[in-house]
Curated annotation (Swiss-Prot):
The record marks E180, D218, E241, K243 as: Required for function. InterPro entries: Herpes_alk_exo, Restrct_endonuc-II-like, Viral_alk_exo. Forms a complex with the DNA polymerase, the DNA polymerase processivity factor, and the major DNA binding protein. It comes from Saimiriine herpesvirus 2 (strain 11) (SaHV-2). The gene is 37. Belongs to the herpesviridae alkaline nuclease family. One of its GO terms (molecular function) is exonuclease activity. It is found in: Host nucleus; Host cytoplasm. GO terms for cellular component: host cell cytoplasm; host cell nucleus. This is Shutoff alkaline exonuclease. The keyword Hydrolase applies. Its EC number is 3.1.-.-.
Amino acid sequence: MDLFSEESPINEIGNMDMTDQQTQLCSSSFSHFLKHPKVQHFISTYSELVKMPTIRYVYFYYLFKKIGGFIGNEKIGTYFSKNVCNNIAAKGVPKLADVYKACEKMNLRQQSEICLLIEEVTRGQYLNSLWDALRDGTISSSKFYWATKKQNSTKKIFEPWPIKNDYYVAGPLAFGLRCEEVIKTVLNELICTPKQASCFDCGFMQSPLDGIFGVSLDYCTNVETNKDNLLVFHPDTEVYEIKSRFKYLFDKSECDTLYKKYKELYSNPCVKTLIKFIFSVSKPAIEFVPSGRLPSESDYLLAYDEEWNLRPTKKRKLNASHEMIKKCIEYNSYAGSQIYILSDPAENNGQITVKSKFKAGIFMNPRHTYFYQVALQHRVVQSYIGLSESPKSLGTQKNFIVSSFFRKRHFSDPPVCYVGKKQLEKTVEIPVFIIITPVYIPRSALLETISQAVNFWEESAKEAFTEYPWAPCALFANGDLTP
């Protein structure tokens, strides 16, 4: 499908089946746009350096003017016509130079509003037909870690990663997708009830400031939806990244070692019984690391307290080359995590509630890829907060990672179970407890990793395209997370 053709998508792909139509939409990516002969010619001949994020908004203009009617959402194309390209002739396909000049004059508010419209149109994430196309050419939270480490090949940035939803039903990926929805309900119904409006289904959030980064959020609070169905991020937005621990899934059977340890935790909820449960698998989800020592990258939760030192291993000392890691540990190590033990529906008339809660000295591992994932979410959400129409002026964004643990269904479970007032689907496992860990990102560490990732993005662009857009360091040099 040619974004520069006047041919209607209905004529181009309307007669295809749904799968082929989705393939065509996915192929309308930023990479394919940049490779188009018209775009390559424009970049090579334009009187100035073609730069980010302007060229990304040019891409959005041509994409949504082309497909808006076909996908049943013309809001983005209409916004461009009324607010950005209002001096460009309505008939025909406008010249690249004219659209680029118009997009170059956009202010931060307009950029933010376009990104919010894109978030709306991409809700549904991996089930959304535009998801792969719009993730292409961006460093998403799942790519941020290896982008800072300059790992993997350029195709990971500039070719779509098709998200296949035909995962093996008993495998960890399908398990994670199922359980994510359950934990959103647990958070919404049992944990975050005093908070303001929550967002369950967040689309793709392109960073409005640079056009290079993008994230999607599992669950957040203190975020509202306005009359136009667009998200409004308040200064005290809380973002929750959900991880479901497949290796701890157990049967409600005396033959299952995990179940025996869980029973101890359930009857006597405390740090001691939690440690016994966590260490009942060969590779525990929480790593003990003594003060002043370097953690491994094997898992994303750490503990300082000696009671976690059940399997002593030698650790390297933190040295001058680990300054960023040291600072991140200092920011996180004393925060602690909140553990919520959930009631067994078989003992509680089908109701899953918070049976008990306690605090433990568990914190985020700054060497793990999930720390980078949360860091980028923080950065992008902060830019939306800064550009938000929120009536609030006070508050600070908070970020959390939620570790969730489940058991398999048992014949003793009631046929219908509830989390708060919400019915639990009969096909999902039973949640037994969650660990909520706050994540703090030092500003200096965030700026350093952002700079590294941008450099990698530009290197990747040089390798992927003959003519490529420029990523000005002015976008990042001052470290402004809000305009």
